Amino acid sequence: MKENNYLELIKNANVYAVAKKSSLDHAVLISSKLNNTVLLKREDKQRTFSFKVRGAFNKINQLSTKELENGVICSSAGNHAQGVALASKINKNSAKVVMPITSPSIKIDAVKSLGAEVILHGDNYDEAFTKAKEIEKKESSVFIHPFDDPYVIAGQGTIAKEIIEEFEGDLDAIFVPIGGGGLISGIASYVKESGKNIKIIGVEPEDSASMKLALKAGKPVTLDHVGIFADGVAVRKVGEETFNLCKKYVDDIITVNTDEICAAIQSIYEDTRSIVEPAGALSVAGINQYVLKNNESGKTFVGINCGANVNFDRLRHIAERSAVGKKSEVLLAVEINEEPGSFKKFCESIGKRNITEFNYRYSDKASARVFVGISLDGRSDDKKNIISQIKDSGYIVYDLSDNEMAKLHVRHMVGGRTSIVGEHIFRFEFPERPGALLDFLNSIGQDWNISLFHYRNHGSDFGRILAGIQADPEQMNLLNEHLAQLGYRYWEETSNKAYSMFLG
């Protein structure tokens, strides 16, 4: 299929039997804060709370009766699965959906409620995809690709058509989340082939920037690791077709971190009173970063709110991280003298500021350590001023605002330091499913003494553990070999300042 057919494919796409023309809402608070007009394309309002139903239905609608005799099959952890299930229900064809075992129950139940058969297999999308392709071959069903298909791309492209038709003024840029590239390929194709002078800017998480890496390499490449916080865009390798379209039409791709995504979720909530999923907040996170880095003002930007399928129990983690992402909170570790009145004196050095978190623990006869969170007033130099103010009062201060171990674990563990010979600290990620914690402990084995352990379920696809393991110097090679064989992603954090100050 020729690339120049996409404009017509999008114009002729059949999506409105299952999708609605989502609203283009003015984000008043975000616009005011950024001194630009920001419009939100509310795909989170679709029946399945995601744009994915557009492409799924358009693809299925192109299939003949004979092709649909054995039904359709797809692999997905959530949004595409619901799109295929709903499209199949409307089209009255059978559907099977292979989902990872780690998929949230809310998404599994949603797919089942739409009449599709759910097959749980594997710990991640790649394993589910392999299983789906096996079933496709065995049963002669039709595989509905989540992004690398012309009709799927065209279905997603109808979003751009709606934006152009609804907004009568000049648009400067459309910010689009990128996973496999289907959404941005459709939007970019329609905008550019229509001759519109509108920038198309993709937004990816820093830890799953598969399209940015592909464009840099000149071809789709496979990521060694995919971050799973923004699970809706956690794709290890982009498609061939989507890569070609992005290479031709996309003006820029920027990446954002977890804290920026959480801050964007909060910003969208404050403007709309709606909670989007992490992937759904990517575009706003991108707009915020783009405006601040380029000092933009007076422009008009559109952000695609691509989905709202977020587990309720993830909101605690999102709320904790959003303050740092919005630069509205600083996390500090402070050493103070251990003497009568020193704690009160330290509090006075902070002044009349809003304290968001305060953990204090006796360390030894000479000193104590404080883990403190302090609200910022929004000025770019406020964090610097706070740190200088505390240092000027004679305290040693360490900024932990960007310290992943401190934010995930240590803030919940402040309770006293101890000296354990040969203790080494490691941070682990493992697929979150029933029994996963016990599986992790069994895999560590009984040959190593665990001296510290902290696990917290963030309501995501992966669990996170901080563990202390004792090993003599001559045992370190053996320990590293053992950990490498476990198959879990891990980082050594023994030299992390948060550990040495509060736990080590």
Give the label of every model feature segment.
Residues 1-436, 440-504:
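PLP-dependent amino-acid enzyme catalytic core
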